Amino acid sequence: MSSTILPTDPDVLPNRADDSAFIEEDTRLRNDIRLLGRILGDTVRDQEGSAVFDLVERIRQTSIRFHRDEDKPARRELEAILDDMSASDTVKIVRAFSYFSHLANIAEDQNNIRQMRAGSTAGSAPRAGMLAKTLAHAREEGIGARELREFFKTALVSPVLTAHPTEVRRKSTMDREMEVAALLDQRERLQLTADEWAQNEEQLRRAVVTLWKTNLLRRTKLTVLDEVANGLSFYDYTFLREVPRLHSALEDQLGGGEGGEAEEELASFLRMGSWIGGDRDGNPFVTAEVLQGTLRLQSARVLRFYLDELHELGSELSLASHLAPITEDVRLLAERSPDHSPHRRHEPYRLAVSGIYARLAATAAKLKIDSVRAPVGEAEIYANVQEFKADLDAIHYSLTKYNAGVIARGRLRQLRRAADCFGFHLASLDMRQNSAVHERTMGELMDAARPTSSYLALDEDERIALLTGELRSARPLTSIFIKYSDETVGELAVLHEAARAHSIYGEAAIPQCIISMTKGVSDLLEVAVLLKEVGLIDPSGRCAINIVPLFETIEDLQACAAIMDRLLAIPEYRRLVDSRGGVQEVMLGYSDSNKDGGFVTSGWELYKAEIGLLDVFEHHGVRLRLFHGRGGSVGRGGGPSYDAIVAQPGGAVNGQIRITEQGEIITSKYSNREVGRNNLEILTAATLEASLLQPRRSAPHHDYLEAMEQLSALAFKAYRGLVYETDGFVDYFWSSTVINEISTLNIGSRPASRKKTRAIEDLRAIPWVFSWAQCRLMLPGWYGFGSAVEAWVAEHPDKGTAFLQSMYQEWPFFRMLLSNMDMVLSKSSIAIASRYADLVPDEELRHKIFGRIRIEWHASVDSLLAIMGHERLLQGNPLLERSIRHRFPYLDPLNHVQVQLLREHRTHDPDEQVLRGIQLTINGISAGLRNSG
């Protein structure tokens, strides 16, 4: 029997005879998957024996029958196979299917890279999402290079990396998987000899065997600083080199000078952000000490990068003084260099670079960061990154002035851009805390200062009056003679540490303070008073940090425009906004609004909130910057970034956008340099498209807005009716999903729930969505849509489905909503979900709730296909359709095994091997779905 773990069933992988190019590409992808499947099969057979390999094949084939036909005999056969397996064999089976999911993902990613390269080398027309396409569109609209350069002077595109409480990837496995990817890439790019081809396969086998021998799961729980270190690895993989390169490429495309050089340097607009190490909301482990450690780790990463680049630059700039004249500034840099080697006496550029290296190494040493290589001598530290940039600029100017501009456009160009984008802090670290914590902290401080009053008893108007008075007052609110609670001491310590960080790394190190669960004006004023207390607001009213409200629930989204209208009318607060350049950032939360009101209503209320905020900010003459808290899954606002950005209301982007890149998708988007570069380009192109080109389009038709409001109300009623108003739903959820078992995984530093209750209201949105994904229902990404459409069509027989079809064709927002739902429903499986429903011990409850879910699922699929004019899910997305067909024969068995293990875990005494098996299935299913929560 062949040792190939590979789908061969024609119903699993049909060809597309209507598209020869697609078939050719599909064949190459299948060949890669076949290669990796064969190597994995050989590994399983060699390491675990033929019996285990044969068992893997039996489970896979039976699972395919069950998936295709909901075959009841196949279901019984599958259950019998799983019942007979030992605990140790179960773990081996799970690892085999999990690793195939990982390897199939690698093959798929490499195929996507291959297609990007093929399009580029063949001179194909640029795709939507590529900068070339957007720039061509701008030219068609009469927008020239000069106008575009002006646009980027005030533009901001900021991907913000977050940790993820259900991120299941280990760096050890990621490193080996990247090795596999590199070897596949080598087979594609290089013309290998027969010996080299054999050697390549041998290296692949070595990597796969190493993977098989490597723990998929962590043995210990991550600390926050572990999460920081994991996040920093993506700077090595992608950001430190690709962010500068993207700027250079765009700069060249906008240039008109000889040889393609830009007429003027493009302003840096792409800035990395992070929550990892600064997000305190619900994470008691993020302390002042952790904040300090995070900033030091970030700074160490970027300073070591600069030092490495300077070392290489010094090797390259061997220009002799009698062959290459220099400016006075470079002469002074060379004279100040501690490098006194006679061999470099007549190489002023090398001397200048060695002096810069020495100063940067001294700066790193002061920050207690070891440099990779010792400098040639002692030097004065850099007071700030501006001094470092000025020295690099001096070298650039000298090279350019004396006819060596081509040299300046090499490594030096990228280093100068990196210094401008990353500074000495690498990424802007946001602080985030829940408004309730700020409220308690302020209450304690106020009551200690005014023993006769009770701050928490005040109404909103009274709080606003008191807080604005504090902002006007010069006296401090805290006292060293008062003993405060541990919580208050901790909050003040974090803010003091932020102030200290500004003095060390610059204000860009911590530019935002985000208030989650913002409910009113006082929530922002409380933070302003706390910032004033630690010196982040000075006596003149200058604020050194942006105060950012985060509106998360449906109710808060509906109130956000009124809250900001009242806030911006307060002179004491408006003065703070003016000190920040007249820009106020507002964050919108996709996750909690979805958990609160369902997918349809969440999307619609977010859209309306943006329109309301635009009106308010225009009235007050303040620039609005939106920060989108999108998750990786559609249930938390995920989906294609380009479509999401260009579907924003006209004027909502306005040249500036911040957007979260959630932990569970960072790996797939940024672990590969080419893929990462493409994703950064997509964000940039979408921001440009939405800002300069979208406002010229007409607003959505009034009838569309009215219909969407009605659909939202109907979907909201259906969703809330199930999740919050159905007796027993909480019990059903906790019994039919892995929510209990998720808490045992060593995959994040933050607890899964805000409080120690089983209430849906207290559960974090991420594990909520993650749990529904694991059982293959994906309920947060579609529930309520089908019944809403059916009810709306029944109420509007004159318009009917044809009207909704027009909405889909003409309105980008509605099209994006349905496209994302199409993706979610395609990954769901009612057949598999029914097996999870069987875990609910109360038979009546099981039939009542799963019966409703099944009916709604079918209604949603039927309504979606009718509106899109499709006959099957993903008909308009053949790439994703193919991806799912490749992966699901290996994903479905993991679900079946997980159900079996959950039943055993919950009905027998605790067994470490069973629990480990459950954890492994969680990892494998997450990999197979390619998003986890």
From Swiss-Prot:
It catalyses: oxaloacetate + phosphate = phosphoenolpyruvate + hydrogencarbonate. Its EC number is 4.1.1.31. The keyword Lyase applies. The active site is at H164, K595. GO terms for cellular component: cytosol. It holds the Pfam family PEPcase. One of its GO terms (biological process) is oxaloacetate metabolic process. It is an enzyme of class 4 (lyase). Signal peptide: none annotated. Keywords: Carbon dioxide fixation, Lyase, Magnesium. It comes from the Bacteria. InterPro entries: PEP_COase, PEP_COase_bac/pln-type, PEP_COase_Lys_AS, PEPCASE_His_AS, Pyrv/PenolPyrv_kinase-like_dom. Transmembrane segments: none annotated. PROSITE patterns: PEPCASE_1, PEPCASE_2. Its cofactor is Mg(2+). GO terms for molecular function: magnesium ion binding; phosphoenolpyruvate carboxylase activity. Belongs to the PEPCase type 1 family. Forms oxaloacetate, a four-carbon dicarboxylic acid source for the tricarboxylic acid cycle. This is Phosphoenolpyruvate carboxylase.
